[in-house]
């Protein structure tokens, strides 16, 4: 499964050593293919598209991040483009038919 993971810094800044550890951790995830991409925000924090077998595996990975307790998280599961289109279209047609009476 793919997830969009957003990390937003909390009120306490990390130490320079924590920052370095977090940067190295992210670089390792990019190198091994765990992360498809990572982008940062000008004001701090950022997003990653990551691959995980399931929610529990993603949570495990998040807790391994060196700044885990210093950021707040927003996680969204992702679908591949067009994944689920047939189901959505069928449900739209069903709803349209129901409204037509």
Give the ranges of each region predicted by the language model.
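Conserved, structured core segments of small domains
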Residues: 1-101
């Amino acid at each position: 499964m793919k997830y969009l993971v957003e990390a937003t810094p909390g009120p306490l800044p990390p130490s320079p050593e924590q920052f370095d550890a977090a940067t190295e951790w992210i670089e390792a995830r990019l190198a091994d293919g765990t992360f498809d991409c990572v982008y940062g925000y000008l004001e701090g924090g950022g997003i990653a598209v990551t691959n995980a077998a399931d929610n529990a595996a993603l949570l495990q990975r998040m807790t391994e991040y060196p700044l885990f307790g210093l950021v707040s998280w927003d996680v969204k599961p992702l679908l591949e483009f067009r994944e689920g289109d047939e189901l959505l279209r069928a449900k739209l047609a069903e709803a349209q038919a129901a409204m037509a009476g």
